[in-house]
């Protein structure tokens, strides 16, 4: 199915108010927002109503954190985690993915390619194919974070279903009042088996 057909199906479901599609997308995006905040990334907005433009569903420019991080490898690993955490949570569902969710996953794959290209551009690896170890580490951290923050993701997903759209200050306030302290470094350094 083409990306345009998937977008049209997602728009149609959105117009009909399909709550299952909204909840699936809300969980996917909530996981990404939680990962972003745990990484110290700023999230300008998140919306479950912007199916026509999946890039607007979550607006977070992780590349802007490069100066603050001063560690390109760590930033790239965390960016991979940010991109893939939604897909990890999607895999837990036994239902077939909605058209809206498939559109978001396609957009995540585009975002993953951007992370790969940044790793090459920043001279961390010689080619895009060499980014797999960085991707693997980011995926592991995202998986570990989902084990630590499952209720937080569910709570934010519920809030997104109610609010439909949240902007940066709303997200920061919500996160500050709901999230427990957690050092992402602890999860990155953990030797626990993840599969």
Predicted regions mapped to residue ranges:
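Soluble catalytic regions of large protease machineries
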Residues: 2-195
């Amino acid at each position: 199915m083409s990306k345009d057909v998937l977008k049209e199906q997602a728009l149609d479901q959105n117009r009909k108010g399909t709550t299952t599609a909204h909840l699936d997308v809300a969980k996917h995006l909530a996981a990404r927002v939680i990962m972003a905040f745990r990484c110290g990334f700023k999230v300008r907005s998140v919306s479950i109503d912007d199916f026509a433009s999946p890039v607007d569903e979550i607006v977070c420019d992780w590349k802007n954190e490069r100066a603050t991080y001063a560690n390109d490898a760590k930033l790239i690993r965390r960016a991979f985690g940010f991109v893939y955490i939604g897909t990890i949570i999607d895999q837990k569902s036994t239902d077939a993915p909605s058209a809206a969710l498939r559109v978001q996953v396609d957009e995540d794959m585009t975002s993953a390619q951007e992370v790969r290209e940044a790793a090459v551009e920043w001279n961390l690896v010689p080619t895009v194919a060499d980014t797999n170890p960085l991707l693997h580490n980011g995926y592991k951290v995202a998986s570990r974070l989902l084990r630590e923050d499952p209720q937080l993701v569910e709570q934010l997903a519920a809030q997104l279903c109610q609010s439909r759209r949240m902007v940066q200050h709303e997200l920061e306030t919500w996160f500050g009042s709901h999230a427990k302290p957690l050092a992402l470094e602890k999860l990155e350094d953990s030797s626990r088996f993840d599969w």
